[in-house]
UniProtKB/Swiss-Prot annotation:
This protein's encoding gene: mraY
One Pfam family of this chain: MraY_sig1
Species of the source: Vibrio cholerae serotype O1 (strain ATCC 39315 / El Tor Inaba N16961)
Catalytic activity: UDP-N-acetyl-alpha-D-muramoyl-L-alanyl-gamma-D-glutamyl-meso-2,6-diaminopimeloyl-D-alanyl-D-alanine + di-trans,octa-cis-undecaprenyl phosphate = di-trans,octa-cis-undecaprenyl diphospho-N-acetyl-alpha-D-muramoyl-L-alanyl-D-glutamyl-meso-2,6-diaminopimeloyl-D-alanyl-D-alanine + UMP
A biological-process GO annotation: regulation of cell shape
One MF term in the entry's GO annotations: UDP-N-acetylmuramoyl-L-alanyl-D-glutamyl-meso-2,6-diaminopimelyl-D-alanyl-D-alanine:undecaprenyl-phosphate transferase activity
Residues that span the membrane, as ranges: 21-41, 73-93, 94-114, 132-152, 168-188, 199-219, 239-259, 263-283, 288-308, 338-358
The name this protein goes by in its record: Phospho-N-acetylmuramoyl-pentapeptide-transferase
Enzyme class: transferase
Cofactor(s) it depends on: Mg(2+)
Keyword Metal-binding applies: yes
Principal place of residence: membrane
Record's signal peptide: none
Membrane topology: Multi-pass membrane protein
């Protein structure tokens, strides 16, 4: 919106030329989203407390979590509000990639909202029935996948980029739709599984979003794309503003979500943020790098798959509890230790993921 106003006013006030620079809009995007989150936080927490919208804690979980019962949840609403407002203000709204990410963010946010509402307001511990949750996640992902394929068919936007191999970029064809579907749905659920401790999911999300901001900038710059031997995708540079909005909103939420948490994001936040990260990874053609940078999400998901598979096949559990962050809690690790160590792992993995762009 502001970039449009800047174009109108630039002939009269040269100052407005500043708003056309991507670097400037990326910085103010972080600050805007951060400011909105910090402003909304206390007000939303107070409102959630008044409405008695509190976290439901399973009796079979770690005993240390019993004290979390009743902590306000559905705080992801303020994350989505901060991101959406910021993107509408600072992004180029003629860019289709911006709308693709917003569609997934808000669509998955709606699915998560219904799930949370049923859990904490209707007191239905199961929330939204699993098959319906999966149905709506799938429907949104497939609509976006088909739209993106139609928009970028047989161009660099539908190539598969393999780390460490600069000349391996095959056209995916219709497999692009399949890959996009699994990346969006898979990342959404992976982030949701990770969201089990105070700040555990939001900080890796912020780090991965920051990593993708750098990748989007390189992918949308023909000189850097050629230098790094990655596809040049003209529309992708505008995703920098979306990524930095996610960084700012995430940091603002972390202010209230850090241990001991004053509010939890709930499924409304976790499903939406995961879906948005998956969509961004697809748009910049770095699905494999997402697996690396989002290694904490992958680890949490694999721990659940291995736990369930082992129990069904052998009747034995591999971990004391899954996802794996609960395993370490039951081993006696204090919650802050688990959280910070997972953050450190995320920092290292994001740096490794960025390094793969050059190691070819």
């Amino acid at each position: 919106m502001i970039i449009w106003l800047a174009e109108l006013l630039q002939p009269y006030f040269s100052f407005f030329r500043l708003f056309e620079y991507l670097s400037f809009r990326a910085i103010v995007s972080i600050l805007t989203a951060l400011g909105i989150s910090l402003w909304m936080g206390p007000r939303m927490i107070k409102r959630l407390q008044m409405l008695q919208i509190g976290q439901v804690v399973r009796n079979e979980g770690p005993e240390s979590h019993f004290s979390k019962r009743g902590t306000p949840t559905m705080g992801g609403v303020m994350i989505l509000a901060a991101i959406t407002i910021t993107v509408l203000l600072w992004a180029d709204l003629t860019n289709p990639y911006v709308w693709a990410v917003l569609a997934v963010l808000l669509g998955y946010g709606a699915v998560g909202f219904v799930d949370d509402y049923r859990k904490v307001v209707r007191k239905n511990t199961d929330g939204l029935i699993a098959r319906w949750k999966y149905f709506w996640q799938s429907a949104i992902a497939l609509v976006v996948a088909f739209a993106l394929y139609a928009h970028g068919q047989d161009t660099a936007a539908t190539q598969l980029v393999v780390p460490f191999f600069k000349d391996v970029m095959p056209q995916l064809g219709l497999m692009y739709i399949v890959l996009t579907y699994f990346v969006i749905v898979g990342t959404s659920n992976a982030v949701n599984l990770t969201d089990g401790l105070d700040g555990l999911a939001i900080m890796p999300t912020v780090l991965v979003a920051a990593g993708f901001a750098a990748i989007a900038w390189a992918t949308g710059n023909v000189n850097f794309a050629n230098y790094l031997h990655i596809p040049y995708i003209p529309h992708s540079s505008e995703l920098v503003v979306v990524c930095t909005a996610m960084v700012g909103a995430g940091l603002g939420f972390l202010w209230f979500n850090t241990y001991p948490a004053q509010v939890f994001m709930g499924d409304v936040g976790a499903l939406a943020l995961g879906g948005a990260l998956g969509t961004i990874a697809v748009l910049v053609r770095q699905e494999f790098v997402l697996v690396i940078m989002g290694g904490v999400f992958v680890m949490e998901t694999l721990s659940v798959i291995l736990q369930v598979g082992s129990y069904k096949l052998r009747g034995q559990r591999i971990f004391r509890m899954a996802p794996i962050h609960h395993h370490y809690e039951l081993k006696g690790w204090p919650e802050p230790r688990v959280i910070v160590r997972f953050w450190i792992i995320s920092i290292v993995l994001v740096l490794i993921g960025l390094a793969t762009l050059k190691v070819r």
